[in-house]
């Protein structure tokens, strides 16, 4: 017969009592009442927060947007083929966040920060909320450093500074993305982290951009966030905020960052789709009343931080697509009023062969002038005015038969200036090259060069400087100003290149 050992039994009971966990897992659970078009109406979830992440039975995630008396309206971030009426939904108690850090560089991710480039998981433990408060006034300082785009017409006439929001606006197929990609390529060696956010683009277009960045060696300091045209509206809506969060991480570490939102028109359309399906009241052009806030809270996150905050910066280049050049539509006017200036691309100029097709007359940079380098500021001061006057005179001269000599001279110089500012795609110029080219045009040193040879002259001038006057380029890149000695050297070089070219013409 087995003997009973009370001491052993009591010790086991004590151990069991000690190990007993009284905590209860309380989760807020609801039931799907209605589902369709990427929207779910859910009964229950009384404790849910606005913007909280929800988890459906099949693992699909959603975001609670409408908190009504008897139900919650949520948008789904995926196809959610397994979700149906009666499915259970659980609130997570979390707001959407995204992985951030050095490991993100060179990767292509979706708006949830998940890699979509086939290179495996991203080894980072840092996370950041997708929606963050913009830095306040005390945390900022005024824009004072240049963000060189490498595009002469922009750096000379519509300069962009670090921490600025400069809108790129124009019809489809006018070279908006090309300007943004050129700017990313030009940041090579500048210790700037770039984030390219593609919203509602064709997957082939995004793959093409990634390939160009890889070829030019720019992917190593760039993060690409892509929400394709086939993705859920909720993901297209979230993509820009994800890009801002990734850039913010580096900004608060004291680094300079550049974010391209390509383009916010498609984000606004995705938000309109979600809002109408959630039965929010429509406003102008059927957009919801808070579409302005949707863009303003995103673009206000771009800033130049004060030295106490580390001195980092986030420069934003949002892109807006217009219909037939109509900048007075709802979304274009909204974003123009939020940003610190706009670069307007004209379809007519593009079709006439002017690339980049920048309409200088209505393009403006409201704060970039303070950040422009002394070298380019000194010589490009009159460039914008001269080109604007040229456009006016060119239109007028079509109807006038006899023009006085001064007007003819102005027209001739304007034609040459316009030719000088033409630039091939993916070939950004450094500051010294820009200074040389603009100086030659503004000072009238190429008035004798035939208009059709101006582009060739500019290329030969740059080549000559690289081969024979490397110290000139180094000096300007180092000092960022054009002193008398450098100016004399430049005049001699221009004269030499011009005479050798005219001799062969």
From Swiss-Prot:
Gene3D superfamilies in the cross-refs: 2.40.30.20, ATP synthase alpha/beta chain, C-terminal domain, P-loop containing nucleotide triphosphate hydrolases
Binding residue positions for ATP: 170-177
Topological category with respect to the lipid bilayer: Peripheral membrane protein
Protein's recorded name: ATP synthase subunit alpha
Main location class: membrane
Family stated for the protein in its record: Belongs to the ATPase alpha/beta chains family.
Class of enzymatic activity (EC top level): translocase
GO CC annotation, single: proton-transporting ATP synthase complex
E.C. number: 7.1.2.2
Function description: Produces ATP from ADP in the presence of a proton gradient across the membrane. The alpha chain is a regulatory subunit.
Site feature Required for activity, where: 363
Keywords per UniProt: ATP synthesis, ATP-binding, CF(1), Hydrogen ion transport, Ion transport, Membrane, Nucleotide-binding, Thylakoid, Translocase, Transport
Pfam families for the chain: ATP-synt_ab (PF00006), ATP-synt_ab_C (PF00306), ATP-synt_ab_N (PF02874)
SUPFAM superfamilies hit by this protein: C-terminal domain of alpha and beta subunits of F1 ATP synthase, N-terminal domain of alpha and beta subunits of F1 ATP synthase, P-loop containing nucleoside triphosphate hydrolases
Self-association state and partner proteins as the record states: F-type ATPases have 2 components, CF(1) - the catalytic core - and CF(0) - the membrane proton channel. CF(1) has five subunits: alpha(3), beta(3), gamma(1), delta(1), epsilon(1). CF(0) has four main subunits: a(1), b(1), b'(1) and c(9-12).
Subcellular location: Cellular thylakoid membrane
Catalytic activity field: ATP + H2O + 4 H(+)(in) = ADP + phosphate + 5 H(+)(out)
Any one Gene Ontology molecular-function term assigned to this protein's record: ADP binding
């Amino acid at each position: 017969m087995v003997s009973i050992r009370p001491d052993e039994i009591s010790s086991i009971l004590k151990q069991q009592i000690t190990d007993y966990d009284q905590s209860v897992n309380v989760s807020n659970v609801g039931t799907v009442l209605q589902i369709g078009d990427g929207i779910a109406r859910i009964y229950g979830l009384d404790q849910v927060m606005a913007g909280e992440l929800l988890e459906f039975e099949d693992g699909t995630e959603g975001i609670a947007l409408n908190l009504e008396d008897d139900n919650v309206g949520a948008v789904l971030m995926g196809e959610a083929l397994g979700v149906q009426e009666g499915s259970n939904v659980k609130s997570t108690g979390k707001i959407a966040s995204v992985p951030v850090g050095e490991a993100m560089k060179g990767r292509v991710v979706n708006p949830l920060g998940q890699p979509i480039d086939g290179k495996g998981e991203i080894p980072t433990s840092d996370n950041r909320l997708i929606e963050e408060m913009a830095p306040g006034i005390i945390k900022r300082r005024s824009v004072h450093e240049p963000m060189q785009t490498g595009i002469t017409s922009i750096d000379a006439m519509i300069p962009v500074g670090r921490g600025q929001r400069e809108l790129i606006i124009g019809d489809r197929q006018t070279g908006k993305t090309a300007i943004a990609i050129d700017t990313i390529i030009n940041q090579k060696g500048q210790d700037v982290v770039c984030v390219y956010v593609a919203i509602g683009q064709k997957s082939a277009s995004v793959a093409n951009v990634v390939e160009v960045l890889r070829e030019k060696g720019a992917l190593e300091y760039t993060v690409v966030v892509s929400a394709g045209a086939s993705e859920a509206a909720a993901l297209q809506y979230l993509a820009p905020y994800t890009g801002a969060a990734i850039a913010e991480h580096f900004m608060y570490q004291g680094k300079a960052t550049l974010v391209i939102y390509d383009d916010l028109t498609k984000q606004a359309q995705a938000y309109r789709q979600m809002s109408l399906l959630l039965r929010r009241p429509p406003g102008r052009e059927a957009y919801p009343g808070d579409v302005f806030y949707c863009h303003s809270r995103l673009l206000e996150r771009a800033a130049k931080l004060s030295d106490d905050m580390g001195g980092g910066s986030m420069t934003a280049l949002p892109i807006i697509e217009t219909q037939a050049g109509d900048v007075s539509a709802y979304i274009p006017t909204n974003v123009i009023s939020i940003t610190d200036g706009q670069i307007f691309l004209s379809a007519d100029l593009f079709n006439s062969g002017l690339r980049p097709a920048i309409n200088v007359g209505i393009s403006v940079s409201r704060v970039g002038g303070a950040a422009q380098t002394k070298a380019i500021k000194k010589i490009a001061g009159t460039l914008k005015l001269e080109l604007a006057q040229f456009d006016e005179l060119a239109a007028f001269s079509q109807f006038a038969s006899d023009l006085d000599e001064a007007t003819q001279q102005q027209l001739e110089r304007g034609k040459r200036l316009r030719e000088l500012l033409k630039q091939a795609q993916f070939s950004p110029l450094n500051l010294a090259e820009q200074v040389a080219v603009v100086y030659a045009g503004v000072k009238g040193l190429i008035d004798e060069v035939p208009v059709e040879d101006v582009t060739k002259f500019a290329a030969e001038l740059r080549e000559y400087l690289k081969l024979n006057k490397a110290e000139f380029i180094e000096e300007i890149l180092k000092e960022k100003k054009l002193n008398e000695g450098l100016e004399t050297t430049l005049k001699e070089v221009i004269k030499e290149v011009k005479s050798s070219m005219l001799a062969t013409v």
